[in-house]
């Protein structure tokens, strides 16, 4: 089992993952960090739990829209 540190909005989180998954976890962490920083730029300071919930909602919305697009494609 491997461990990587991801940073989201200047806070570090240790994440355990399968060996070989480290690069993917770091990429996903950077995506979360970008979303979090974008939200804090737009909204100002919000508490960490709220921020992470909002990031999750944004990503869930993007995924939902992609699924709609894929399911309606010929």
PLM regions and their residue ranges:
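N-terminal intrinsically disordered, cationic/polar leader segments
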Residues: 3-5, 74
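Amphipathic, hydrophobic secondary-structure cores in small proteins
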Residues: 5, 12-14, 42-50
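An acidic intrinsically disordered interaction segment
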Residues: 11-31
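Short small-residue beta-strand/loop micro-motif enriched in glycine and branched aliphatics
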Residues: 14-16, 37, 66-67
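Short amphipathic alpha-helical segments and their helix-coil junctions
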Residues: 29-42
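Long, hydrophobic or amphipathic alpha-helical segments
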Residues: 45, 49-52, 56-74
